[in-house]
Amino acid sequence: MQNMSLSHLAYELKDPEVLRSPIVFASPHSGREYSKEFLQSSVLDARVIRSSEDAYVDQLIDFIPEMGAPLLLAKVPRAYVDLNRAADELDPSLINDVHSRAQNPRITSGLGVIPRVVSNARAIYRGKLSKPEALARIDQYWFPYHRALRCELLRFNCRPDLR
């Protein structure tokens, strides 16, 4: 296997030259590519929005492919869409036409799949988002990231020598 890097809007996948480990390293909160539109739609400045990042964790673990394991890095910031949440963790306090199904402390605190707040409970937006906008973010970022993660995990099923 050659050393490859697959890039998508939502993630970057770094493969090792030689696959030696059955572990997939995934970093769903390493994204820091903030669109101008997102920054303009927020009531917060870029520095405050970035307080929700796991800043530079991707650089801390960038050596993983050299150790023989794949590395999946988020490119989208978690303040825009949180890849470490379920796709249906939609916050009715943030997204129009969404109704609460059950009590979920993450959603209640503003940390659903589309976060309403960053650290110290600071609101990201002035008002609510439309449901189509929220679902478009999930389609564009959440699903591709999780498909890539699932594909990497399935790859190990074909390699009994790595189980």
What are these regions (language model features)?
Residues 1-163:
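N-terminal catalytic or cofactor-binding beta/alpha core of small enzyme domains
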